């Protein structure tokens, strides 16, 4: 199946969803050589991954993951692709805690650092939040505390077959897209930041076909896989079974533009300190970007009707002490 897929890819032909699914199944099962795996990943990257191919690969990867079921709960994820080179602090992790304090159920899927100094797993460990949760513990944490971390490497064990090849290739592959598309929990919504504007609409199509009810796939004009405060953010939103593309700016929400340097982070320890400062009410650009992204989670999490209301609520959550209180509850 994989060899047939490679032959099509080198002719720059698009794989069907089932062909991509079959090829990825073989990879996940560890049935292929590293040479064939590298050829498949390189060929896809050169050709450009299409919606059907991403969908098929995501389906295979999810089927190989350890499952987490949150019955009768509408939970969302805020996992992004990473790889944006922005060197920001862990914005989505911070915004997730704020949103959870506002009543959103967060199934935060993530991993240790890839291209940055601090992945979500790294900063949460530094914050004292448990990352090594079993499926039943994830379910209980989401139900009782409103947020739990799903450590990707513990739930996607088949990825061990891929790790050496990805490291050897040294460039972005389809797996950079698959991470945020393969949350082991049966989420209903997602805020998904991507490293390239060209990916927002295609990945929204994938999420829609995966059955998500609400989602925002977004990319900042500066390349951030977050809603940025340096300028415009491109958004592809899933709502009522359709995808709408639009642009938002910080001033639309009464937030002043800042420089990318103003939201830079560092080591997991430094980023943990930044997050605690924000949750305790410290102002400035770092709070602003956390508030904007928390607003997206509050909106997709069905707590607010729009982003403007989300911004107001996120500010109130922080200023009332509820955000820091939620953090204390999580540790």
Curated annotation (Swiss-Prot):
Residues given in the record as 5-phospho-alpha-D-ribose 1-diphosphate binding sites: 80, 83-84, 88, 90-93, 108-116, 120
UniProt cross-references to InterPro entries, sorted A to Z: Anthranilate_Pribosyl_Tfrase, Glycosyl_Trfase_fam3, Glycosyl_Trfase_fam3_N_dom, Glycosyl_Trfase_fam3_N_dom_sf, Nuc_phospho_transferase
Sorted UniProt keywords: Amino-acid biosynthesis, Aromatic amino acid biosynthesis, Glycosyltransferase, Magnesium, Metal-binding, Transferase, Tryptophan biosynthesis
Top EC class, one word: transferase
Domain of life: Bacteria
Binding site for anthranilate 1: 80, 111
Subunit structure, as described in the record: Homodimer.
Name of this protein: Anthranilate phosphoribosyltransferase
Lineage: Bacteria, Bacillati, Bacillota, Clostridia, Eubacteriales
Chain's gene name: trpD
């Amino acid at each position: 199946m994989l060899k047939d897929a490679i032959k099509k890819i080198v002719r720059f032909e698009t794989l069907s969803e089932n062909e991509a699914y079959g090829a990825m199944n073989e990879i996940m099962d560890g049935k292929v050589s590293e040479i064939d795996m590298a050829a498949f990943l390189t060929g896809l990257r050169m050709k450009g991954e299409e919606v059907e191919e991403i969908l098929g690969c995501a389906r295979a990867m999810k089927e190989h993951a350890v499952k987490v079921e949150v019955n009768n709960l509408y939970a969302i994820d805020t996992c992004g692709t990473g790889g944006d080179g922005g060197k920001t602090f862990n914005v989505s992790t911070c915004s997730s805690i704020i949103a959870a304090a506002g009543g959103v159920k967060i199934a935060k899927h993530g991993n240790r650092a890839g291209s940055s100094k601090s992945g979500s797993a790294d900063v949460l460990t530094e914050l004292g939040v448990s990352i090594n949760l079993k499926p039943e513990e994830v379910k209980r944490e989401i139900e009782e505390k409103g947020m739990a971390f799903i450590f990707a490497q513990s739930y996607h064990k088949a990825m061990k077959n891929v790790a050496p090849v990805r490291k050897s290739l040294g460039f972005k592959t389809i797996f950079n897209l698959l991470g945020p598309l393969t949350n082991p929990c049966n989420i209903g919504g997602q805020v998904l930041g991507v490293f390239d504007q060209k990916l927002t609409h295609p990945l929204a199509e994938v999420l829609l076909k995966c059955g998500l009810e609400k989602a925002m796939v977004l990319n900042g004009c500066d390349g951030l896989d977050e809603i940025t405060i340096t300028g415009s953010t491109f958004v592809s939103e899933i709502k009522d079974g359709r995808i709408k593309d639009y642009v938002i700016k910080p001033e639309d929400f009464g937030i002043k533009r800042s420089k990318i340097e103003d939201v830079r982070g560092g080591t997991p320890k430094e980023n943990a300190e930044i997050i605690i400062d924000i949750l305790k009410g410290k102002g400035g650009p770092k709070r602003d970007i956390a508030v904007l992204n928390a607003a997206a989670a509050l909106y997709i999490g069905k707590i607010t009707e729009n982003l403007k209301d989300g911004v107001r609520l996120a500010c109130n959550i922080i200023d009332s002490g509820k955000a820091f209180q939620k953090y204390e509850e999580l540790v």
